[in-house]
Amino acid sequence: QRCEFRFVFMGIETPDPDLLAVTQKKVNSMKPIVERIHEVYKHGIAISAGFILGFDGEKSGTGDAMIECIEETGIIWSMVGLLVALPNTQLTRRLMREGRMIDCGTQQLLPPSDEVYRLENLANTDNTTSGLNFITTRDRVEIYEDYRRVVSTVYDPARYMARVMRTTKMLALQRRQKPSMAEFTKMAKALVQIAWWMTKNPQVRWHYWSNTIRSAMMGMAK
């Protein structure tokens, strides 16, 4: 807070503590996630977080739990993606032995093998939607449906702007340094550009200006 760190990224991945234990990511479930996130807000730091769908052992309803987690924590920037089995990882080696990996080029199932898996990453590929390069234990269509529902829900204009407002109220900002004239000019130009785009979009126009006015009433620090 004294150094004025403003943003941090957290790889939450999934709100299911049992699934985190299975995937050997126990550190992510050491404390209740909502309390941990809100504690960070008390130090004036906003959070962006990564969430992943497609883990082995993932249960039906994971998408709903993910939406609830994002709403309760107030995380504004939620990067929701599909699991990618990367080369030279414990996960990929296991999936190769089980004969569950899919060839990126031919989209054909690879036979069980101890060979090193090769991942061909095409230019301009969206890393959040290009996952599931293996046979999932959960129904694949269900995972895609969960993904679509999570993204469309958390980025619904009304819900998103309401979450922004809740998080803004929790952020305990302390301005110790004043921006230079160059920095102020740059931020002012960015603000004008954002306002123009938001006003142009009828779906977000009212929500944006409502939030802007309410934030202005909280003071310049917000």
Identify the role of each PLM range:
Residues 1-187, 199:
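A structural motif corresponding to the C-terminal lobe/cap of the Radical SAM core domain
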